[in-house]
Swiss-Prot record:
SUPFAM superfamilies: Tetrahydrobiopterin biosynthesis enzymes-like (SSF55620). SMART domains: FolB. Homooctamer. Forms a hollow cylinder assembled from two ring-shaped tetramers. The gene is FOLB3. Its EC number is 4.1.2.25. Keywords: Folate biosynthesis, Lyase. This is Probable dihydroneopterin aldolase 3. Pathway: Cofactor biosynthesis; tetrahydrofolate biosynthesis; 2-amino-4-hydroxy-6-hydroxymethyl-7,8-dihydropteridine diphosphate from 7,8-dihydroneopterin triphosphate: step 3/4. It comes from Arabidopsis thaliana.
C-alpha cells in the first residue's frame, strides 16, 4: 500500500493534521497548556488589504495586496447560551482592527505586522485566550521566481 499524502484517505489525513497541531502546541506552549486550550474557535480567513510593508523600495512606494488569516481560541459557551454579540468577539471589530494595522504605517517585516495584529487583538479583546495570525503577500514578485505566498504565521497565548 502506498502511504504518501496524495493517496492517504481524507479522514486519516485530517486526524494526522489535528495530531500535528496538538504536538506543535505542546512544543510551543508546553504540555500543561494543552489541557487549558479552549476547544472553541472563531475563524477569519482570507481578509484582504492593501499595504506598504516590506524592505524593498518598490514595496514601500507601490504597496501591494496582503492576506490575513486569524484563528481565535476562546470560550464561546456564554455567547452560545445568550445568543448575544456582547458575549463573544465581534467579527466586524476584529476586521476593523486588522484593517487599521495592515493599512497603517509600513513595517519592514511581515513578522512584525503579524505580531502587531496578535498583540493588539489580545490587548483589545480580553475573551481571547490564544490567537493564530497568518500574514503575507500572495504572488510576490521575486527575481527569477514564482511563489504563491510569502508570509509569517504566529501563535500567541494570553499571559494571565
Amino acid at each position: 500500500m502506498h502511504s504518501s499524502l496524495k493517496t492517504m484517505a481524507p479522514a486519516k489525513l485530517e486526524r494526522l493534521c489535528v495530531l500535528s497541531f496538538f504536538l506543535f502546541c505542546a512544543t510551543v506552549f508546553g504540555t500543561e497548556s494543552l489541557e487549558s486550550l479552549p476547544e472553541d474557535k472563531l475563524i477569519l480567513r482570507g481578509l484582504k488589504f492593501y499595504g506598504f510593508h516590506g524592505v524593498l523600495p518598490e514595496e514601500r512606494e507601490l504597496g501591494g495586496l496582503f492576506i490575513v488569516d486569524i484563528n481565535l481560541w476562546l470560550s464561546l459557551k456564554k455567547a452560545i447560551e445568550s445568543d448575544n454579540l456582547a458575549d463573544t468577539v465581534s467579527f466586524a471589530d476584529t476586521f476593523r482592527l486588522v484593517k487599521k494595522i495592515v493599512e497603517g504605517p509600513p513595517r519592514n517585516l511581515y513578522e512584525t505586522v503579524a505580531d502587531d495584529i496578535a498583540s493588539e487583538m489580545l490587548e483589545t479583546f480580553p475573551k481571547i485566550n490564544v490567537i493564530r495570525v497568518k500574514f503575507g503577500k500572495p504572488n510576490p514578485s521575486l527575481v527569477n521566481s514564482t511563489v504563491d505566498f510569502l508570509g509569517a504565521e504566529l501563535f500567541r497565548k494570553r499571559n494571565h
